């Protein structure tokens, strides 16, 4: 593996926190709106951002892809959103769950909570829960908004309305603090969603990215493309010493030497920084991420000599 390629991977993983902060800021450019108690409603809201970021956030500069998809599917005029689906597929092919690890504001929020000094618990024994997010994607994002409709043929955005904690964190709380009318209108649904947010906050302090692992439908969608994404993990078998440090460092419970592009891998780069021989790195292009050592080839003359003996 070239030193230049390995060095770039180390640099990217080292500055991941700054990249996450920058992505969160770009996703929420209109910060003065927090004081005004209103929403940005310009042309940017016609474009989806890659991560989970609520449309109702006063500072949001774009639309949440999950919320936008449900709005179209639940509409009485349309039955499917080709634009948003195509947008998500494109991001999935280009980046996969790199978006989760580097560009998602709510993922970064959970990581910051996890830095609070307290006893941490592993999620390795809770791996079956990782399949819940696929059920959330299928049922709450696709099926219910499309088929559970009212008298005029409109469906609710079930994930956003009943489950997503980001909507409360970025939308309901700041808007209600700045707007007395919204504050007076808060009811039982807000109480339910606020309880979910509190649960995610507490779990995030103890577990690493619990919402990302277990419930996020956007992460589930990107995970479907992790194995074919152009942005992948690369393991150089010729320099790997099988020390296991990469697997111990991974907080997403992935052994990169066995499955470099596992569906749960968010390309955070912890394994890259933990590897003592720089055998693990990021790569961009096609392939399975495994670089097998090249077997030495015997000279032709030597082979002919051995055959005649």
PLM-predicted stretches and their roles:
Residues 1-257, 263-309:
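Non-ligating segments of multi-cofactor redox enzymes
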């Amino acid at each position: 593996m070239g030193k230049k390629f390995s060095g770039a991977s180390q640099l990217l993983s080292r500055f991941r926190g700054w990249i996450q902060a920058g992505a969160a800021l770009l996703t929420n450019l209109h910060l003065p709106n927090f004081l005004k108690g209103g929403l940005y409603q310009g042309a940017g809201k016609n474009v989806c951002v890659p991560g989970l970021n609520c449309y109702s956030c006063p500072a949001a500069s774009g639309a949440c892809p999950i919320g936008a998809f449900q709005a179209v599917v639940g509409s009485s005029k349309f039955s499917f959103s080709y634009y948003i689906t195509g947008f998500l597929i494109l991001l999935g092919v280009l980046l996969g769950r790199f978006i989760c690890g580097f560009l998602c504001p709510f993922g970064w929020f959970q990581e910051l909570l996890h830095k609070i000094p307290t006893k941490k618990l592993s999620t390795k024994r809770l791996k079956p829960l990782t399949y819940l997010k696929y059920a959330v994607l299928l049922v709450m994002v696709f099926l219910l908004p499309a088929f559970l409709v009212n008298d005029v043929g409109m469906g609710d955005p079930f994930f956003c309305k009943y489950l997503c904690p980001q909507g409360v964190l970025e939308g309901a709380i700041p808007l209600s603090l700045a707007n007395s009318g919204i504050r007076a209108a808060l009811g039982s649904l807000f109480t339910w969603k606020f309880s979910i947010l509190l649960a995610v906050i507490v779990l995030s302090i103890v577990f690493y990215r619990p919402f990302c692992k277990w419930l996020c439908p956007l992460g589930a969608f990107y995970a479907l493309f992790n194995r074919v994404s152009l942005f992948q993990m690369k393991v150089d078998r010729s320099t790997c010493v099988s020390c296991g440090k990469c697997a111990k460092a991974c907080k997403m419970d992935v052994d990169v030497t066995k499955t470099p592009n596992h569906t749960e891998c968010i390309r955070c780069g912890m394994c890259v920084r933990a590897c003592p021989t720089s055998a693990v790195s990021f790569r961009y292009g096609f392939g399975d991420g495994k670089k097998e050592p090249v077997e030495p080839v015997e000279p032709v003359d030597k082979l002919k000599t051995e055959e005649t003996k």
